[in-house]
């Protein structure tokens, strides 16, 4: 059906535009805080009710708004930050479009009280749904206080998409955390339900603000970074290779003190760390990139979270070099830290191109040694000169390996109904392993490679899931309970995660302030650091659990625990362990892939192998 083109009413266009700027209460907190910082404030108080869904109030001691400009402040595209197009390429303020207050006021009730140093009295204005309701003089201190309530009342559809109160509060605290890292010289306090949630005192030392935000325990494992070219200056703090996180949530990137989510910067960080930390783990980094405003375009994203660099290669190389310099300064050369041992989870795709020749040579050398000393018999699965297994285990098993091995050799395979899964793996002829990561088997019509980490990961996932669903998870009480200090956003998220933690055998509860106490872990993972484990699980649910059901979030946790508990790439398995792995695979459903969807095994047909040698 054809319809005429019509001009949309102004109220509707304002609400559509507001949807680009105001996604959730945290968006409002961000815009109001940025306005306060742009006004030169050195003291900012934030108040949240119902996680920001009920009320948001931001009060500052900045320069205030002139009385004659108060009404204009709520007009769309009215701003004091720029006056002409070229100013966009010189802007250093957080805001410059003149959209924030207009967008916020169009979907809420907004009250603004402000006074400048030149005015004897302040001004109070109330705007609801984009319409001015009240405007009067008011007594108030120098600065601005903005109160936003009835959020999304005029846009009920958007209101339905809001999460639980604790989740929305955590989003708000995340925004405050990032802005506090960019502005250590400003005191920021946050209140909710009459109590102080967090307090960031003003400091001239960035390291003090970083320690306060991340926690002293994490900050102690960070190293300062610094690098400079003729166009770019890079500073900040970055973690040592032995301190990693489950997600990228601990990577904070700032361009000219503006928090951004930039793929180029994230890629530069991971490039510097790619050969010193294991795959699927991430460093903790607080990164500041400073350059001429003319060399970066901040007018790319409505929320100003993305930027575009005029010379991206220059920025990329400066970040990589600054981080690499820090790592080199610690005596951690890239080659010496390449992890393919017990702590790694390396995959073929993560082996650097320049390492292929040396790895192939080493594989051939080890193969020739094995052929000469052990005389492995092709196709028999036996050794002519078997080694002393107890001596071998005593020499090889250390740290986490022993728990992964116990889960292979001692844990019974999950019981399945008869004939529900055809046992094919136990019948395969084991030939050896490639890089102590991929198990090689001879089959009737070719060669089969099994990723030992992915296979064990799938086995453990099904065991953990089954035990959790039946409330039969084996638990080990910690001899000395672990007290863990969380960041305020993570502490808010902890309450949502507690039922899932209990389900998998982790006993933890609040311990006062922003601390929690961990009393027990699942036996399967009792060897892991309790604090790192719980932090990773909170991050896992925060980053990847949005919009998922409790069951789906539970499966995210099962997959994470299985990954941490499984044998690693680079971890040598003896024949008994390989045999047990095959038997467990036969009894495990969905054995073709790991919980993350990667293949467990790959078949190389004989005809393809013969074709490579031109026999066909």
Swiss-Prot record:
Keyword DNA damage among record annotations: yes
GO molecular function terms noted in the UniProt entry: ATP binding; ATP hydrolysis activity; ATP-dependent DNA damage sensor activity; mismatched DNA binding
Keywords on record: DNA damage, DNA repair
Entry-linked InterPro entries: DNA_mismatch_repair_CS, DNA_mismatch_repair_MutL, DNA_mismatch_S5_2-like, HATPase_C_sf, MutL/Mlh/PMS, MutL/Mlh/Pms-like, MutL_C, MutL_C_dimsub
GO-annotated biological processes: mismatch repair
Pfam families noted in UniProt: DNA_mis_repair (PF01119), HATPase_c_3 (PF13589), MutL_C (PF08676)
SMART domains given in the database record: DNA_mis_repair, MutL_C
Residue stretches spanning the membrane: none
One GO CC term on file: mismatch repair complex
Function text: This protein is involved in the repair of mismatches in DNA. It is required for dam-dependent methyl-directed DNA mismatch repair. May act as a 'molecular matchmaker', a protein that promotes the formation of a stable complex between two or more DNA-binding proteins in an ATP-dependent manner without itself being part of a final effector complex.
Entry's family note: Belongs to the DNA mismatch repair MutL/HexB family.
Protein name, per record: DNA mismatch repair protein MutL
Organism of origin: Syntrophus aciditrophicus (strain SB)
Record lineage: Bacteria, Pseudomonadati, Thermodesulfobacteriota, Syntrophia, Syntrophales
């Amino acid at each position: 059906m054809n319809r005429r083109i019509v001009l949309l009413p102004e109220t509707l266009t304002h609400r559509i535009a507001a949807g680009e700027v105001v996604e959730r209460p945290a968006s409002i907190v961000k815009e109001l805080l940025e306005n306060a910082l742009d006004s030169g404030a050195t003291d900012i108080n934030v108040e949240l009710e119902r996680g920001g869904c009920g009320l948001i109030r931001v009060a500052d001691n900045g320069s205030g708004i002139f009385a004659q400009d108060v009404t204009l402040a709520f007009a769309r595209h009215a701003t004091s930050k720029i006056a002409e197009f070229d100013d966009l390429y010189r802007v250093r303020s957080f805001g410059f479009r003149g959209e924030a207050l207009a967008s916020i006021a169009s979907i809420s009730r907004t009250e603004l009280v402000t006074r400048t140093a030149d005015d004897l009295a302040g001004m109070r204005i109330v705007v609801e749904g984009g319409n001015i309701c009240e405007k009067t003089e008011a007594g108030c201190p120098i600065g601005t206080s903005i109160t936003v309530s009835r959020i999304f009342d005029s846009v009920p559809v958007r209101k339905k998409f809001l999460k639980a109160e604790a989740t929305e509060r955590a989003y708000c605290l995340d925004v405050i955390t990032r802005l506090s890292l960019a502005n250590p010289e400003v005191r920021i306090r946050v209140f909710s339900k009459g109590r102080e949630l967090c307090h960031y005192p003003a400091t001239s030392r960035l390291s003090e603000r970083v320690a306060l935000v991340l926690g002293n325990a994490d900050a102690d494992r960070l190293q300062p970074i610094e690098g400079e070219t003729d166009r770019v200056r890079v500073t900040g703090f970055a973690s040592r290779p032995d301190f990693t996180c489950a997600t990228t949530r601990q990577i904070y990137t700032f361009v000219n003190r503006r928090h951004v989510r930039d793929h180029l910067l994230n890629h530069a960080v991971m490039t510097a760390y790619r050969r010193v930390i294991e795959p699927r783990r991430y460093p903790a980094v607080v990164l500041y990139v400073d350059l001429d405003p003319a060399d970066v375009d901040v007018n790319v994203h409505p929320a100003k979270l993305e930027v575009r660099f005029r010379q991206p290669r220059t920025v990329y190389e400066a970040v990589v070099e600054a981080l690499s310099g820090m790592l080199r300064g610690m005596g951690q050369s890239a080659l010496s830290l390449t992890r393919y041992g017990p702590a790694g989870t390396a995959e073929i795709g993560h082996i650097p191109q320049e390492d292929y020749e040396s790895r192939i040579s080493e594989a051939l050398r080890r193969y020739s040694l094995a052929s000469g000393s052990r005389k492995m018999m092709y196709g028999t699965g036996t050794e002519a000169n078997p080694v002393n297994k107890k001596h071998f285990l005593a020499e090889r098993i250390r740290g986490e390996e022993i728990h992964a091995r116990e889960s292979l050799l001692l844990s019974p395979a999950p019981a399945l109904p008869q004939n529900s899964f055809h046992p094919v793996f136990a019948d395969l002829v084991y030939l050896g392993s490639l890089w102590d990561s991929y198990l090689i088997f001879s089959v009737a019509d070719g060669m089969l490679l099994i990723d030992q980490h992915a296979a064990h990961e799938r086995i453990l996932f099904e065991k953990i899931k089954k035990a959790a669903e039946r409330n039969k998870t084996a638990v080990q009480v910690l001899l000395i309970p672990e007290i863990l200090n969380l960041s305020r956003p993570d502490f808010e998220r902890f309450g949502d995660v507690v039922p899932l933690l209990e389900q998998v055998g982790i006993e933890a509860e609040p311990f006062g302030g922003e601390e929690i106490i961990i009393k027990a872990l699942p036996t399967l993972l009792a060897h892991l650091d309790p604090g790192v484990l719980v932090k990773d699980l909170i991050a896992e649910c925060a980053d990847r659990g949005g919009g998922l059901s409790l069951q789906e979030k539970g499966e995210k946790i099962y997959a994470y625990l299985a990954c941490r508990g499984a044998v690693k790439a680079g971890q040598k398995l003896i024949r008994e362990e390989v045999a047990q792995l095959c038997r467990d695979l036969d009894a495990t459903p969905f054995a073709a892939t790991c919980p993350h969807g990667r293949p467990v095994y790959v078949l190389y047909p004989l005809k393809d192998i013969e074709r490579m040698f031109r026999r066909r």
